[in-house]
Amino acid sequence: MDLPDYERKIVIDGRIENGSPAMVIVSRSVDYFAPLNLETLMNDVFIKNAVVTVSCDGVSEQLQFTLCEDSPVYLAYVGRNIIGEPGKRYDLRVEIGDTVYTSSTTICQPFHLDSVWLAFANEQDTTPTTRIQLTDNPATHDYYMFQLKIHGKRLHDRLWVTSFPVAFDDATFSGQTVNYEILRANPSSLFESTMTDEEKDEFYRMTYRKGDTIYMKTSLLDYESYLYWSAMTYELSVGQNPFMSPAPVPCNIKGENVIGNWCGFASTIDTLYYPDDAVARRRLVRR
């Protein structure tokens, strides 16, 4: 079978969160069947010479390409001086040679959950999930996103893991008090081939075990960011099924031949503990 030539795209994945500087990863997409190794990533995928600038309230900062523990690939363009604040707009400008890409995002006001708890099926259940209760603001149209981290006896998430559902709006419960089950979505299967069965069982689990400390990040998004992350809900649910077609994921980056997202997060973090002697319905300790 002769496959058509693949046209590579510029990929811009950027974020800024209340209390943190901006982080942007700039790369090129690759053919599905192209060989991928460390040398290819460093020399052909990551773009290390872009000029990445973030602006807010008339102040601009050029981000520096550096090692970054918060980046999935340990490398990113990172800011220092402009720190995310609720209610402010942040403009992104990326220059690659003579080509310019731009985007804007807003950090909303942070939102606090009413409560979050470990949800047990019955008194004998030892692998709970998490449930949340929230009261929606009837005066605004809100867009919610959740992420999770586990620090356990064996599993220690370095990055925030996307939940399922990834993101949703308040169209069906505006102004109401509701509760949802929030599951730890399976991370990428990229590393599965290098894991033992025991490691896979630990890494890809959606429930919690005794000794876990669970961090839940609740974020409010602006509308453009919500469109991107809500589309990712579908991709996470069926994207690794070879019999399903991938869905188009919206892009809020302006420019030619580009995909990606520049997203502002208004976030709060709650902490749950599941000690070895835990009983059903142990409640949140809020920080």
Protein language model regions, located:
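A sequence/structural signal for flexible, mid-protein segments enriched
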Residues: 1-287
